[in-house]
Amino acid sequence: MLATNTYLSTQDVFPEKSQTARGLYDLLLSELCKLGSIHEIKKAISISFSSDNQKAFAWVILRNRSIKLVFRTNHRIASQRIQSVTHVAEKNYDHTILLDSKTAIDDELMKWLGEAYQTSK
């Protein structure tokens, strides 16, 4: 289930982005909805996703032909796919990954996002 709390319309968020970025976002959103109840909050430069308690577990920053995805877990994930890891608080790590093709939204990524979703509850 998807609930949208928005400050901007989808058209405002994607005005000059390519169809590639839009397609990646739509696929990511579809996969996130399989995790459970998702709240989508659209802002000027990013879109955040939270579980029912409104604690964000992932953020996307839209680029012209890709998406920069940041997600938070309670442990550090070691993978060459992850561009950076920031230790933001005790047992909170933000991981950044670049999504530039639909194949990047795979089982491994969804496992990580599932962990992030569960951590946010």
Indicate where each model-derived feature is located.
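Charge-dense, helix-prone N-terminal extensions
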Residues: 1-121
